[in-house]
Amino acid sequence: LLLALLVALACAPARANAAEVVLLHSTDRDDARTRALARGLADALTGRAAVVPVLLGRRERGDDYFDSRFETLRRKFGERSPAVVVADGQAAFAFVRKYREDLFVGSPVIYCSMPAPDPQYLRQCGDCTGLPETADPAATLKLLFTLRPQTGLIVGIMDDSPETDTLRRVSEEAMEAIRVQGLGQARMLFPGHEPGDDAGLDMARLRAVASSVPRAGAVLFLGFPDLEGEEAGNEGEAVRQLVSRSVGPVFAASDRWMGSGVAGGVMVPGRELGAAVGALVLRIMAGEPAGEMLPEPVTPRPVVDMTVLARFGVARELIPADAMVLNEPNRPQEPAGAVSTGFAALALAGALAGVYLLLRRRAGRKDRWPGPRP
């Protein structure tokens, strides 16, 4: 008993001082992507550090909001310096740069879920490296036409941010290239962001747009503004409205919405990104300075929901070989050692025929009985 107590006392400080990796998300809400990223990171660390996720908030919140989040986190973490701080998205990266002298002092930083930042921003975050990532709506459009070449209309949904406006221009250029290559001849429009229709989208207008998408159409979701007041809404609610009201499939360039009725897109799966972040964390924990690591861009790949695509008549054979396939319908399999249905039916028919012949033979012997009947 005394030995067990001594072992427990010796281990207690080690547990209390276990390495921490703080994962700052640039969102207010937990969703499929934040969970997948945290899970992939934890799996990669294999217990060598604890992952502490924090829903920091989206950047539209403003300075006062992030000042209050800083005070909350300072009370929570005190003087603790995590082994690594992971900034998931631009809001988290800006937060770390602004408060690094007072929070998580001396902790190396890894950024992800955002394009490569300006070099001056890298200098502001101290010992820093990252996994640059850029949304690829052009590849998502190519995937869309691979799966549904008959698509005649692409309805783009976007917010008012400069980043999303860039994605729109990339999408329009990609659509023109698709036309030139003869891969598709669809029209593309962005309701609320067209000449003569430039007032943006609210939730009521979004519902009307979703209901007007034809069967030969599809939706390309790039973003949606977080609204307040009577028509309050957010991206999650926008996706739900699109999926429930549109008779055409919805495609996106982020796996944040996979599993909620989105058909697919070309993206970096959250769990794979978490594993890549985890590999960098382990190198840092082994003593390699983060600032000396070259940023390693992550490559998106097709991700599709086969259950959703099946509703639109998309055959499994059209799915790219490198795609991550979610929710693939199970094919019925016969248990090992089971006899096939056709063979069983043939065997039954043979058995019945044998019984019939046996009865006929016995009846024939009765008709030829040599003596008087019993």
State where each predicted segment sits.
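Bacterial N-terminal signal peptides
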Residues: 1-10
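Short hydrophobic alpha-helices and adjacent helix-cap/hinge residues
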Residues: 15-373
